[in-house]
UniProtKB/Swiss-Prot annotation:
<dbReference type="InterPro" id="IPR014710">
    <property type="entry name" value="RmlC-like_jellyroll"/>
</dbReference>
<feature type="binding site">
    <location>
        <position position="94"/>
    </location>
    <ligand>
        <name>Fe cation</name>
    </ligand>
</feature>
<keyword id="KW-0408">Iron</keyword>
<feature type="binding site">
    <location>
        <position position="101"/>
    </location>
    <ligand>
        <name>Fe cation</name>
    </ligand>
</feature>
<dbReference type="GO" id="GO:0006096">
    <property type="term" value="P:glycolytic process"/>
</dbReference>
<keyword id="KW-0963">Cytoplasm</keyword>
<comment type="pathway">
    <text>Carbohydrate degradation; glycolysis; D-glyceraldehyde 3-phosphate and glycerone phosphate from D-glucose: step 2/4.</text>
</comment>
<keyword id="KW-0324">Glycolysis</keyword>
<feature type="binding site">
    <location>
        <position position="140"/>
    </location>
    <ligand>
        <name>Fe cation</name>
    </ligand>
</feature>
<dbReference type="GO" id="GO:0006094">
    <property type="term" value="P:gluconeogenesis"/>
</dbReference>
<comment type="similarity">
    <text>Belongs to the archaeal-type GPI family.</text>
</comment>
<dbReference type="InterPro" id="IPR011051">
    <property type="entry name" value="RmlC_Cupin_sf"/>
</dbReference>
<dbReference type="InterPro" id="IPR016758">
    <property type="entry name" value="G6P_isomerase_archaea/bacteria"/>
</dbReference>
<dbReference type="InterPro" id="IPR010551">
    <property type="entry name" value="G6P_isomerase_prok"/>
</dbReference>
<dbReference type="Pfam" id="PF06560">
    <property type="entry name" value="GPI"/>
</dbReference>
<protein>
    <recommendedName>
        <fullName>Putative glucose-6-phosphate isomerase 2</fullName>
        <ecNumber>5.3.1.9</ecNumber>
    </recommendedName>
</protein>
<dbReference type="GO" id="GO:0005737">
    <property type="term" value="C:cytoplasm"/>
</dbReference>
């Protein structure tokens, strides 16, 4: 028997970084990101004043969990640094790793940091109207390298799931994004890929 779902509509509110009409919302505070940054003393200093502040939030619309369906949503990330590392998401690979994902930049300046199963590293600059294709099997995380909130829409198969423990089990991704130079605007921000020198 053919089961049909009703068409749906959501609106991306770039100003708030949320999806109007979302069926789900979750947030990560800075306190939730323990162990993510190299500079533990800088992290603890931030926690002392902003521990319960939202580092990033996700709102999404999930019609179903069926394999042929899709999830759409919006991620909003705060700007800033801990030590010399930019604010970033925990990163993940899909629980069904052969599932892809798409990201579309709405506002801000960011980098999509990707790592293949073979340890290959790719970085994709994310700005407004930039679309990023994350292939199957690639671990990925978002990094806000700008001075304003980074807002992106995304879409992936509804049965993909997320595995957030893979990075922790591996001891971190192979690269981090840090900042050099003086920050006085987006054009002065330079992502520096530091290879195996540092691990998260």
């Amino acid at each position: 028997m053919l089961i049909l779902f009703e068409p749906g509509v959501c609106q991306v509110d770039v100003a708030t970084g949320r999806l109007k009409g979302a069926t789900n919302r979750y947030v990560k505070t800075f306190r939730d990101l323990a162990g993510l940054y190299r500079d533990e003393s800088a992290y603890q200093a931030l926690i002392a004043t902003r521990g319960d502040d939202v580092a990033y939030e996700v709102t999404d619309y999930k019609p179903s969990a069926n394999g042929g369906d899709i999830i759409i949503g919006v991620t909003r990330m705060e700007p800033g640094k801990i030590g010399d590392e930019y604010f970033m998401t925990r990163g993940h690979i899909h629980a069904r790793p052969n599932r892809p994902e798409m990201y579309y930049g709405e506002a801000g300046v960011g980098v999509m940091l990707l790592e293949s199963p073979h340890g290959e590293i790719r970085t994709i600059e994310m700005r407004a109207r930039t679309m990023c294709y994350v292939p199957p099997f690639w671990i990925h995380r978002s990094v806000n390298v700008g001075l304003e909130p980074l807002v992106m829409t995304f879409s992936y198969p509804a049965d993909a799931g997320q595995d957030y423990d893979v990075i922790a089990k591996a001891g971190g991704m192979r690269t981090v994004l840090s900042m050099t130079g003086t920050v006085d605007g987006p054009q002065s921000i330079t992502p520096v890929i530091q290879g195996d020198t540092h691990r998260l």
